[in-house]
Regions:
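Acidic, PIN/NYN-like endoribonuclease modules and their adjacent C-terminal/linker elements
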Residues: 87-101, 112-146
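Amphipathic coiled-coil/heptad-repeat helices and related helical stalk/stem segments
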Residues: 26, 107-108
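A generic structural signal for well-ordered alpha-helical segments
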Residues: 33, 74-75, 115
Length: 146
């Protein structure tokens, strides 16, 4: 199996939340790409539980326990891989630091750095992630927009 795709939290949420506007699009993408493997990491898993259990996310927000149960059910997929945080924040941001323009990019930059470190790709619906790398940088191929 290839290194696969690290799913950004926006992809994880759309995958698991049936009323999410991108639920169908993410499932169609996964149907084409899941065979290459897909991954989560502690940061994406934590963010998933935090967001789905936040009443500001949905009037139907889950309890943290229910969000964990939903996460666990999705992670049972045979193509799922867990990527440990094997690279420090500082090391993962080194190639991206010059392009960081604000605090909202820090998490995306870390996830991209982890994907590069693992020789996988970051699958996201956030087009701004590609701006973390210069236009002609071959590492832009490490970002897959869904």
């Amino acid at each position: 199996m290839k290194a696969g795709f690290l799913l950004d939290v926006n992809v994880l949420i759309a995958m698991a939340w049936p009323t999410h506007r991108d639920h169908q699009k993410v499932h169609e993408w996964l149907a084409r790409h899941a065979r290459d493997g897909w991954a989560t990491c502690p940061l994406t898993q934590t963010s998933f539980v935090r967001i789905l259990s936040n009443p500001a996310f949905s009037a139907n927000a889950l309890t943290p326990t229910d969000a964990l149960t939903l996460l666990q059910a999705n992670l049972a997929h045979p193509a799922h891989r867990f990527w440990a945080d094997e690279v420090s924040m500082i090391d993962s941001l080194k190639p991206l630091a010059q392009k960081l323009a604000g605090h909202q990019q820090v998490t995306d930059a870390y996830l991209l750095g982890l994907a590069i470190h693992k020789r996988g790709k970051l699958a996201t619906m956030d087009r701004a992630v590609r701006t973390l790398l210069p236009d002609k940088n071959p590492e832009r191929d490490f970002v897959v927009l869904i």
